[in-house]
Structures are given as structure tokens and as C-alpha cells.
Amino acid sequence: NYREGYGMFAVNGILFNHESPRRGETFVTRKITQALANIKAGKQKYLYLGNLKSKRDWGYAPEYVEMMHLMLQQDEPEDYVVGTGEAHSIEEFLDEAFGYADMDWHDYVRIDPRYYRPTEVDFLEADISKAKKKLAWEPKVKFSELVRIMVDADLELAGLDTPGDGEKIFKAKFADWHRWEHQV
């Protein structure tokens, strides 16, 4: 192993999908929450997506940063998988996001073959057992909470009222709700 051979303190974090309101707008989670806000604001009519059955292990990005810091605080360097240990489909994300906003995604989502990936991986789920066992780490933010945080942030960015659960979840588990805002 390279790090042992050269006596280096080096760790690898194998990070599964990590999301937040800062996520780029072309990534499916942010594409969904931003489109939801735009639809509610009357700026957009439909959201075009590809494979809704694809499943991913989506976690909350700030927690992954905390995990990376924790990995670096250990006496011995090791590699860790960082994720939630749960996989959810894009359809589940739509159900959660639009349901939270009292909307039916079926009214707004259109399937567009252009968004199907030729080499789509249908299922990705992290095995976080080593992180749980050795570092006593597991994510605090659950899937539905992550979605609510992201929906509230995009509704707020669009100047709309939010249901408010996202902010409550964030404040209960972290600190300043406006920490996600882009700095100008």
C-alpha cells in the first residue's frame, strides 16, 4: 500500500452523492427542488427528467464534511465509505419534494429520453458499516429531512413562503439556517 510504503498519513473518503442547497442546478436533486420552486412561482410549467427508477444513496453534504474531518483526526489513516446506507429512487425524491410542497409531481414532470444515460447505473448504495463501527459515525439527516431542507432553501431563494420544516430540521441538527446562502 502506497501510504504504508512511504509512511504517509493519507486517507481516502469514498463519498456517495452528497446534496445541499448549494448543489449545482444540473444535478437531479437540485434540478427537482429548483424546478418545484419555479413552478410554484409561475416561472416554469414542467420539469423534464429521464429514468425515475434509478436509485442513489443521497446524503447531506455538511455531514460528509464532518465525516472527512473525523477521518483526519484518527491516529491511523484508513479509507472510509461515506454515505447513508440507504438508496432512494428519483421517483421517491419527487414524491417527498412535491408532497412536502402540497403538489402532485405527476402534474409537472415529463419524461424526456434525452435525459436517459446510455450507461446508467440503476442502483448505488453505500456500505457505511466501517464508519459506524470504527468511528461511531452515521448521518443525522434522514432522506425526507434532506429533501425538505433543499425544498425550503429553493422556495426561499424564489421569494416564496416555505412550509418551514427544512429550517427547523437544520437548526435542530446544526446551526445557522442561512449558512447555505451564496456569498456575493
Tell me what each language-model feature is.
Residues 23-184:
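C-terminal substrate-binding subdomain of Rossmann-fold SDR/epimerase-dehydratase oxidoreductases
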Residues 16-19:
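Proline-glycine-enriched beta-turn/loop adjacent to the NAD(P) cofactor-binding site
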Residues 11-13, 80:
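Hydrophobic/aromatic beta-strand patches that form the interior of the parallel beta-sheet core
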Residues 1-11, 33-41:
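Active-site Tyr-X1-5-Lys
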